[in-house]
Amino acid sequence: MAAATMALSSPSFAGQAVKLSPSASEISGNGRITMRKAVAKSAPSSSPWXXXXXXXXXXXXXXXXXXXXXXXXXXXXXXXXXXXXXXXXXXXXXXXXXXXXXXXXXXXXXXXXXXXXXXXXXXXXXXXXXXXXXXXXXXXXXXXXXXXXSLVHAQSILAIWACQVVLMGAVEGYRIAGGPLGEVVDPLYPGGSFDPLGLAEDPEAFAELKVKEIKNGRLAMFSMFGFFVQAIVTGKGPLENLADHLADPVNNNAWAFATNFVPGK
């Protein structure tokens, strides 16, 4: 009796296995299902400066661009006076350094202008202008943000420096080697958690944004240098100098300080 029950309950009759349920491959066949995110495609820019075939500004020089030069890094004889883009590997490294330093300079120029704008808007900030900040930071108890000593308990500039080293080291480590933020595809433009706004979804807009980033970053690096020189000479921030110049363009300009070799006076 037990043997008969076993025979009935087993999924094989007369030595042939009976299929209880079809496999997944039989149900779906050989079709492939792919899912992708639908992103609205933005039209490529009509700007002559940021498109792929950008106008070369150095028309008088030799117009034949080198093979390594893209639209963003014109390597004509006049553009790369120091021959920094002579070797392709060096050009790639220089482009990486330019993008990283340009992003930093864009943030720095925004911060220098924003601090001056906040001071102009009568928000009482205890921090000095961009010019005098380095001297004030080394003094003890100088890093009281927004004039409230209880807001940030980091009165030591060395403690702030150590925290910055740890935090930026961790972020840069994830950017280069991957980690909990996702795998690394391109270390210079990591994407994923590093791109919360999704600016790199559309490849055409992304290529145009890369060019704009490098061009605006070069402008920001040069303008930050100008802010420093202005602050050393005049002792004022960039917005104060702009307001003074607009108030009296004839007297308040660079020539008024060109004969003044004592900084800050």
Swiss-Prot record:
Cited InterPro entries: Chloro_AB-bd_pln, Chloroa_b-bind
TM stretches of this protein: 151-171, 219-239
Keyword Plastid: yes
Stretches of the chain forming a coiled coil according to its record: none
Binding-site residues, chlorophyll a 6: H245, A254
Domain of life, per lineage: Eukaryota
Location within or outside the cell: Plastid, Chloroplast thylakoid membrane
Record's signal peptide: none
First and last residues of the transit peptide: 1-34
One Gene Ontology cellular component: photosystem II
Post-translational modification: Photoregulated by reversible phosphorylation of its threonine residues.
GO molecular function: chlorophyll binding; metal ion binding
Binding-site list for chlorophyll a 5: K212, Q230
Binding site residues for chlorophyll a 1: R218
Membrane topology value: Multi-pass membrane protein
Any Gene Ontology biological process: photosynthesis, light harvesting in photosystem I
Similarity-based family: Belongs to the light-harvesting chlorophyll a/b-binding (LHC) protein family.
Protein's recorded name: Chlorophyll a-b binding protein 1C, chloroplastic
Gene: CAB1C
